[in-house]
Curated annotation (Swiss-Prot):
Recorded family membership: Belongs to the metallothionein superfamily. Type 15 family.
Function: Metallothioneins have a high content of cysteine residues that bind various heavy metals.
Alphabetic keyword roster: Metal-binding, Metal-thiolate cluster
Organism phylogeny: Eukaryota, Viridiplantae, Streptophyta, Embryophyta, Tracheophyta
InterPro entries: MT3 (IPR044671)
Protein name: Metallothionein-like protein 1
An example Gene Ontology molecular-function term: copper ion binding
Keyword field contains Metal-binding: yes
GO BP annotations, alphabetical order: cellular detoxification; intracellular copper ion homeostasis
């Protein structure tokens, strides 16, 4: 059974990446000072701008 992942059929929708950029906020506290770090990942490859699937997704070469 497959589930719909954006415009791409994937066996597990949790394995598919989201469109655009993703941001993670990491706050590290050591002794009396804190440091905030923002990590930005580049978007995954798209198929005609309609479909994104992560490398472990069953539909890595889906046709959208």
């Amino acid at each position: 059974m497959s589930s719909k992942c954006s415009n791409c059929d994937c066996s597990d929708s949790s394995q598919c990446t989201k469109k655009g950029y993703s941001f993670d906020l990491v706050i590290v506290e050591t002794e009396n000072r804190s440091m905030d770090t923002v990590i930005m990942d580049a978007p995954a490859a798209e198929n005609g701008g309609n479909c994104k699937c992560g490398p472990s997704c069953a539909c890595v070469d889906c046709k959208c």
